């Protein structure tokens, strides 16, 4: 007999979309009657033959006064406490939407915005990879609501929270966030098998991945391979004990950053330093930027931190009493798995306590402890087609939202030529399944990249093209990324720009489209560019012209409400603005002083 339960999202702290009917769902014995008592009314539903029920609650006005929903079924009672009615948003995408508020901490900045608004709540859906083509859950298999004034608030989506805070400060209505973001997920990971099969591009992969036991077999193979690699490192490492004991094995003298090429295995770094007299050692942190791939860090032979992969910043708290007057040693091992690694350029390496610093840039000894063969990367399931559809994306279809916010595209840089098609299909299919024309606000990728291969420029161009989809908007984020970090910390401004787009699209009903170049008028020696609204040029280094496939920089200047380009070589095949991977200093701005999207035009 099926026990009476409510789906996980219908739990304490729930925010329901105002002014529309909401269906509250769960499970009960087939034929059982479920009743809801709320606000003096009673509403009912009956469980179907599969033991599922959908109980319709009529639309309610916005309310910041917490209330209770009381359910009864077969002698059992369930109560959802602390329920609000406001505006609910589906936030999704990759790690930059997933990135929690705690990861936006910048130890070199005095500004750190902490969440503190009880009217903003997030439901974090579990990330569950699934390649079964027939699996499509009606409800999330877990999850809970977090209030932004609670202990767990630092793990809420930073971009999502700052979006919600900006919006809440304007409209003063409770905000709910349903977060299905998954680091590294591709746009095709959020589409069902039958849609992916329409294109033919994914058939070979789907034939393999949809076979029973794919995840289990692949995981076992990966773990076996990675386990053998780790055991080889541990068995061959003869430097750990002497370095941690304070001995000084010979090695290469280096300063940070360090790039290691054509090497897989383990490297040790160590450095001795004097603790300055009067240095406030209590509360100190060891700051080592980011590295590739895995590190374990020590102060005076005691482990203070460990990070298993390349992306997170190495901010390690040093236990009080570990730093001592006089000589100290900082050391860390670095495991390089795939043939290239090192300590990332452009970061700051130091011990910090309050406003006091001990610089750690130079004076390191680098010792190669173990050399191995490059390891084959483990399978990153959630970056694959279909992976986060059936158990992570599909359960959102039955919920009511004000809009969807998506920050996604990094994983699709390698196939940017397909992105417009796949993103458009994602939006179309999502709207068809949820049954209404949900507004969709995308986040264009910011600047990033050590090597300019053009992949992110092409992806941004595809994202701009996706703005042709009706009832969509896009926040332009160049200028607030970090060239040497895939996860820039300025999510406050990301959230603010998303809120501006959302307000225009979903509230003011004016529509919202990024500023576009609407015309090119060629003159002797140059061209006049006109735009969909007045623009302001604050530099001239980002305009280029293409002649016979060769890209040449051209001078630009303000002319009226547009831009004039000097073209001494005549009419080009194409004109580009900021069309490269890392345009970190935007030069063209709209009437709101927001950056204009990179573009190209014939």
Give each language-model segment a name.
Residues 64-74, 329-332, 573-579:
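Short, aromatic- and glycine-rich surface loops/edge beta-strands on solvent-exposed regions
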Residues 204-210, 218-251, 460-521, 539:
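Catalytic cores of secreted or luminal carbohydrate-active enzymes
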Residues 25, 273, 277-301, 330-332:
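Aromatic-lined ligand-binding clefts that engage carbohydrates, nucleic acids, or primary amines
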Residues 42, 532-602:
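C-terminal beta-sandwich/jelly-roll accessory domains of carbohydrate-active enzymes
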Residues 3-4, 77-147, 179-259, 327-401:
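An acidic-aromatic loop/edge-strand motif
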Residues 8, 16-21, 261-265, 285, ...:
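Surface beta-strand/loop "capping" patches
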Residues 3-4, 9-84, 338-342:
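Ser/Thr-rich low-complexity repeats and stalk/linker segments
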Residues 40-63, 290, 297-350:
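Beta-strand-rich ligand-recognition modules
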């Amino acid at each position: 007999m099926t026990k009476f339960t409510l789906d996980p999202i219908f739990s304490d702290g729930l925010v329901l979309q105002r002014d529309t009917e909401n269906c509250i769902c769960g499970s009960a014995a087939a034929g059982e009657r479920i009743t809801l008592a709320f606000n003096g009314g009673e509403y009912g539903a009956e469980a179907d033959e599969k033991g599922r029920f959908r109980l319709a609650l009529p639309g309610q006005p916005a309310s910041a006064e917490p209330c209770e929903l009381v359910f009864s079924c077969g002698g059992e009672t369930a109560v959802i406490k602390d329920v609000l009615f406001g505006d609910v948003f589906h936030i999704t995408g990759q790690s930059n939407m997933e990135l929690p508020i705690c990861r936006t901490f910048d130890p070199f900045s005095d500004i750190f915005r902490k969440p503190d608004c009880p009217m903003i709540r997030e439901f974090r859906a579990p990330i569950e990879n699934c390649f079964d083509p027939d699996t499509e859950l009606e409800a999330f298999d877990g999850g809970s609501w977090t209030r932004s004034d609670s202990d767990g608030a630092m793990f809420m989506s930073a971009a999502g929270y700052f979006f919600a805070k900006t919006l809440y400060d304007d409209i003063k209505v409770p905000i709910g966030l349903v977060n299905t973001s998954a680091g590294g997920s591709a746009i095709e990971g959020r589409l069902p098998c039958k849609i992916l099969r329409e294109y033919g591009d994914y058939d070979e992969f789907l034939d393999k991945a949809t076979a029973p036991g794919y995840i289990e077999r692949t995981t076992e193979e990966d773990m076996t391979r990675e386990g053998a690699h780790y055991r080889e490192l541990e068995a061959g490492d003869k430097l750990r004990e002497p370095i941690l004991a304070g001995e000084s094995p010979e090695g290469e003298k280096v300063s940070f950053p360090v790039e290691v090429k054509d090497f897989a295995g383990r490297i040790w770094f160590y450095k001795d330093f004097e603790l300055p007299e009067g240095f406030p050692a209590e509360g100190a942190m060891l700051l080592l930027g980011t590295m590739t791939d895995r590190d374990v860090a020590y102060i005076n032979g005691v482990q203070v931190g460990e990070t298993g992969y390349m992306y997170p910043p190495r901010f390690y708290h040093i236990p009080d009493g570990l730093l001592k007057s006089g000589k100290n040693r900082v050391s860390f091992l670095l495991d390089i798995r795939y043939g290239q690694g090192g300590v990332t350029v452009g970061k700051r390496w130091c011990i910090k306590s309050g406003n006091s610093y001990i610089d750690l840039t130079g004076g390191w000894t680098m010792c190669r402890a173990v050399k191995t063969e490059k390891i084959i990367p483990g399978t990153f399931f959630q970056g694959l087609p279909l992976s986060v559809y059936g158990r992570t994306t599909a359960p959102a279809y039955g919920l009511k939202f004000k809009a969807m916010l998506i920050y996604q595209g990094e994983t699709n840089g390698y196939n940017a030529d397909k992105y417009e098609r796949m993103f458009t299909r994602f939006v179309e299919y999502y709207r068809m399944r949820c049954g209404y024309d949900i507004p969709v606000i995308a986040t264009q990728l910011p600047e990033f990249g050590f090597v300019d291969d053009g992949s992110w420029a092409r992806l941004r161009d595809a994202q701009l093209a996706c703005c042709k989809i009706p009832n969509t908007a896009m926040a332009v984020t160049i200028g607030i990324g970090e060239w040497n970090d895939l996860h820039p910390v300025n999510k406050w401004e990301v959230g603010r720009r998303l809120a501006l787009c959302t307000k225009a699209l979903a509230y003011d009903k004016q529509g919202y489209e990024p500023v576009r170049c609407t015309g090119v008028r060629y003159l002797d020696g140059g061209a006049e560019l006109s735009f969909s609204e007045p623009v302001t040029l604050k530099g001239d280094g980002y305009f280029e012209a293409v002649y016979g496939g060769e890209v040449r920089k051209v001078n630009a200047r303000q002319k009226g409400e547009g831009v004039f380009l000097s073209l001494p070589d005549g009419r080009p095949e194409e004109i580009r603005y900021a069309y490269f991977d890392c345009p970190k200093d935007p030069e063209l701005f709209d009437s709101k002083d927001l950056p204009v999207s990179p573009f190209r035009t014939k």
